Curated annotation (Swiss-Prot):
It catalyses: NAD(+) + H2O = ADP-D-ribose + nicotinamide + H(+). GO terms for biological process: cell surface receptor signaling pathway; negative regulation of exocytosis; neuron remodeling; synapse organization. Residues 32-134, 143-232, 242-350 form the Ig-like C2-type domain. It comes from Danio rerio (Zebrafish). This is Interleukin-1 receptor accessory protein-like 1-B. The keyword Transmembrane applies. The keyword Lipid biosynthesis does not apply. It is a single-pass type I membrane protein.
Length: 700
């Protein structure tokens, strides 16, 4: 019994002497605290885990058996963090249990995460250390937690071994573990160059498609234990210095720049794979680093990653000069280096003398191109541009203010028995389309002989008078017009011929079809050379009936400019009670109506003539919105005897009873009304005088 006590004392002393100091955190209540051990336990939810007391694996030179023989006790405590209050662990013997110097969780749960301290002590000695445990769930849709993977790197075309780590606690001693390997959580048909032995996966020739996550799985009782390794593949380690891509490495680059302008220099380089070493690239001016220069105008940018593949990198760095000065001129060098060497490229900045040759040529070229563009635009859209200018900034024709009509329309009617499809279209154009468009759409006032001419003298004199009162002469040139020589009337009358030759009136010649094969066409060409102010416009056909067609724009351009007149109010138009005996002749022009009325009233009764003349002439002068006329009817005298009207032409369908100043039989007395139907029954047609039948009026 006496020999046993000294033996225990010697064993206890040996244990105490075998303690080694690693990194003491401190001593609290006489217990040496080694803080948290570097080995951290990380396990997935539902997997078993064994936490071993680190005191026996690096802090003391004794194992659990020796410590227990020396009378030291091992106790376990848990805390949420290392600084929190520690509490004793309740061991249930089933899920949580103690096994010699280790603590088992079968399986681990999320609430088991924390710090576990093992304390080795007796009445006179105390030492402890903490181990961290993390329990986590699998990432969504995966068989591992992405934060618990081991990282491994492999070089392209070389071999690599992937170990299934930390599985010795789950393998019986003396036996090899049975490991199943997965890639990206799925079974894989491994190629022949990949060999599996026990807990090792060996890749003999690493390829780029070997990049991925490798999971090893072993069976431990009723539990599964998984370990995942992320493999990244890199290019082989380089043994060469970086390569400068821009500017050229073996050539001096000269840049001629103007002073005062900004400058930006860029250096690009290629770095082979050098492990975890960052690329080194920078600018220097002469022998000085850019950051050592006193100028704030000159600065260097951060290194920019252009691209990266398998660890090989292409990077760039920029040098910026806000405003180039004389002292900034010189050599700027871009340097690149790694563990195998350094290279550089030089850019020389020099001042550029001002040369205006290129600038002058460019300016003249731009002006020439602009001039060509404007000329082409004017050629293509001359009429549209002139109409736009005239409508917005033009003024009305002052020289034509004393003329009553904007245009006189000359046209040859076609006999109905000679009509064809072409002549019908020409007749429709001349009688309907042309007047309607010019009068109703554009607001022009036309003189159309068949509609507006009432004879006051010979036919030629009437035509000359009406043409003289018009600003333009529109000749609708049709084959029938050429055959009948419709222009002869303008050659027979001296006044008309002088107007055409002297340019007193502008002529608009509208060709409705091809006239070159028509008889008398040579005379048409001679007529064109005779007219001083002539514009020839071709009518394309019914397809150009829209107002925005080229034909109507050109015709509007040749017509005199006039601004749209405001619509007449009710007071400006004669009502039925104020229109007098000519109320039903609203389509007859004022000038023609006055002439016809004066001729008719000359043969009427003197009293009737006097009363009607005074009343109607006053009303016409005051209320008609075109113009007023003063016309004195002779107190005596008669018109020449009227001849019987032939079947050639009717100037205007005017009741003879009104033109002669007579009342039809049975008409009420003065001041009384007669129905329109009764008046029309007794209407007669105005016959032509003998002198007016000398020239056919088929041609207007």
């Amino acid at each position: 019994m006496r020999s046993r006590v000294p033996l225990q004392i010697l064993l206890y002393a040996a244990v105490i002497r075998s303690l080694k100091v690693v990194s003491k955190r401190g001593s609290v209540d006489g217990c040496t605290d080694w803080s948290v051990d570097y080995l951290r336990y990380r396990v997935l939810l539902g997997e078993p885990v064994r936490i071993k007391c680190a005191l026996f694996y690096g802090y003391i030179r004794a194992n659990y058996t020796h410590a227990q023989s020396a009378g030291l006790s091992l106790m376990w405590y848990r805390s949420a963090t290392h600084t929190d209050h520690e509490e004793p662990i309740t061991l249930d013997g089933t899920r949580t249990l103690k096994e010699e110097d280790a603590l088992w969780f079968r399986p681990a749960q999320l609430q088991d995460s924390g710090h576990y301290s093992c304390v080795l002590r007796n009445s006179s000695y105390c030492m402890k250390v903490s181990m961290a445990l993390t329990v986590a769930e699998n990432s969504s849709g995966l068989c591992y937690n992405s934060k618990m993977r081991r990282l491994e790197k492999a070089e392209l075309s070389k071999s690599k071994d992937i170990l299934c780590p930390d599985i010795q606690d789950y393998t019986p001693a003396g036996s090899e573990p049975h490991v199943t390997w997965y890639k990206e959580c799925r079974p894989k048909q491994w190629r022949s160059s990949i060999i599996r032995t026990a807990d090792l996966l060996s890749i003999r020739d690493v390829r780029e498609d070997d990049i991925g996550n490798y999971t090893c799985e072993i069976q431990f009782g009723r539990f599964l234990v998984r370990r995942t390794t992320e493999l990244t593949v890199t290019a082989p380690l380089t043994d060469k210095p970086p390569k400068i891509l821009q500017p050229p490495e073996h050539k001096l680059s000269v840049m001629e720049l103007q002073l005062g302008g900004p400058v930006n220099l860029t250096c690009r380089a290629f770095f082979g794979y050098s492990g975890d070493v960052s690329p080194l690239i920078y600018w220097m001016k002469g022998e000085k680093f850019i950051e050592d220069l006193d100028e704030t105008r000159i600065r260097e940018s951060e290194i920019k990653m252009v691209r990266e593949h398998l660890g090989e990198q292409e990077v760039s760095v920029s040098l910026t000069i806000d405003s180039l000065q004389e002292e900034d001129l010189g050599n700027y060098s871009c340097y690149v280096e790694n563990g195998h060497g350094r290279r550089h490229a030089i850019i020389q900045l020099s001042r550029r003398e001002l040369m205006y040759t290129v600038e002058l040529a460019g300016g003249l070229g731009a002006i020439l191109l602009m001039l060509i563009f404007l000329v082409s635009l004017y050629k293509c859209y001359r009429i549209e541009l002139m109409l736009f200018y005239r409508n917005h900034f033009g003024s009305e024709d002052v020289d034509g203010e004393n003329k009553d009509y904007d245009a006189y329309v000359s046209y040859t009617k076609v006999d109905p028995d000679q009509w064809s499809q072409e002549t019908r279209e020409e007749e429709h154009f001349a009688l309907e389309i042309l007047p309607d468009m010019l009068e109703k759409h554009y607001g022009y006032k036309l003189f159309i002989p068949d509609r507006d001419l009432i004879p006051t003298g010979t036919y030629i004199e009437d035509v000359a008078r009406c043409v003289d009162q018009s600003k333009r002469l529109i000749i609708v040139m049709t084959p029938n017009y050429v055959v009948r020589r419709g222009w002869s009337i303008f050659e027979l009358e001296t006044r008309l011929r002088n107007m055409l030759v002297s340019g007193e009136i502008k002529v608009i010649l509208i060709e409705c079809s091809d006239l070159r094969g028509i008889m008398n066409y040579q005379e048409v060409e001679a007529l064109k050379h005779t007219i001083k102010l002539l514009t020839v416009i071709r009518w394309p056909g019914p397809g150009s009936s829209k107002p925005n067609s080229r034909f109507w724009k050109q015709l509007q351009y040749e017509m005199p400019f006039r601004r749209p007149e405001p619509k007449l109010s009710h007071e400006q138009v004669l009502d039925a009670s104020e229109q007098g005996p000519f109320g039903e002749l609203q389509t007859v022009s004022a000038l023609s109506m006055v002439s016809a009325t004066s001729t008719a009233m000359a043969t009427a009764h003197p009293d009737l003539r006097s009363g009607f003349h005074n009343t109607y002439n006053t009303q016409l002068r005051q209320k008609h919105y075109y113009r007023g006329y003063e016309y004195d009817i002779p107190s005596s005298g008669t018109l020449p005897p009227l001849a019987t009207m032939g079947s050639q032409h009717t100037y205007c369908n005017i009741p003879m009873s009104l033109l002669n100043g007579q009342r039809p039989p049975g008409q009420p007395a003065h001041g009384q009304q007669q129905s329109l139907e009764e008046q029309q029954v007794n209407n007669a047609l105005l016959p032509l005088l003998p002198r007016e039948t000398s020239i056919s009026s088929v041609i207007w």
